[in-house]
Design a protein with these regions (language model features):
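Class II aminoacyl-tRNA synthetase catalytic cores and aaRS-like
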Residues: 1-273
Length: 273
């Protein structure tokens, strides 16, 4: 966006160090990442809404939508009313053809880290605060809300994104608040802060989890049912036998040394006499 592209999307293969669960594969996912310049949160959400209305109409004609337009629910209201930030708004949860989409908006910008006694970003450090809440970064960070948005379908979070910060002064304030010192921030993000100082278009976007999106659309309950060659719970691919051990020769060719884990005396089992 800083480089002058007004709109772009990509199909991104994402690798993360995360534990698997019903709606998340072991360490990997496929996303449709959408980014727009000269945009607003409303424009991003309107784009996603129109895209999914067309998707359901053209690809899943047997299904129907609970509400149009899709509800936009503040984060605090979702927790108070549904006790979750991923509410399932279907009127009949036994109907496999009902699709209830909603957006969760107005998220807290920060959350308090009790262990380290500092503020952490609720989403990421580049998420823009609501314009009227910029002043709260200095005075009352816990009350500041952001331009973050999540997209939920039948109780599954299928997308998330935000509008980004474009003011270098605001960005440096947030760096400092979350424990990134000014010198460190300028060293790590100098290219970005310098670009911001020349002016950058307001921009933002959303990333749609392609695999996760298919779970409710196809009437499944687990991600393994909608992806090819799903891995086991401990990350093994039974189809190709991966991961596997490298031979000593391959390790030498690659310059890799395997360091065996030392067993502490506490973990050693002692036989009873």
């Amino acid at each position: 966006m800083v480089g002058g592209l007004e709109r772009y999307y990509q199909l991104a293969r994402v690798f993360r160090d995360e534990d698997p669960r019903a709606d998340r594969a072991y360490g990997e996912a496929t996303q449709i990442d959408i980014e727009l310049s000269f945009t607003s949160q409303d424009e991003v959400l309107n784009l996603v809404e129109s895209m999914f209305i067309a998707l359901v109409r053209d690809v899943f004609p047997e299904k129907y939508l609970t509400k149009i337009p899709f509800p936009r629910i503040p984060y605090a209201e979702a927790l108070k009313k549904y006790q979750t930030e991923k509410p399932d708004l279907r009127q009949n949860k036994d109907d496999p053809n009902e699709l209830a989409f909603c957006f969760i908006v107005d998220w807290p910008l920060f959350e308090w880290n009790k262990e380290e006694r500092r503020w952490d970003p609720n989403h990421h450090i580049f998420t823009a605060p609501k314009p009227e809440h910029v002043r709260l970064i200095d005075t009352d960070p816990g009350r500041a809300h952001s331009l973050q948005h999540d997209f939920v379908l039948n109780g599954f979070e299928i997308a998330g994104g935000s509008i980004r910060i474009t003011d270098p002064a605001v960005q440096e304030k947030i760096f400092e608040l979350v424990g990134i010192k000014k010198e460190e921030g300028r060293h790590k993000f100098q290219h970005m802060l310098e670009a911001f100082s020349f002016g950058v278009p307001p921009h933002g976007g959303i990333a749609i989890g392609l695999d996760r999106m298919l779970i409710p659309l196809l009437g499944e309950t687990n991600l393994r049912e909608v992806i090819a060659f799903p891995k086991t719970g401990d990350g093994r691919d039974l189809m190709v036998g991966a991961p596997s051990s490298l031979s000593e020769q391959k390790l030498r060719e690659l310059g890799i040394e395997v360091i065996k884990e030392k067993t502490s005396p506490k973990n050693k089992q002692t036989k009873k006499r």
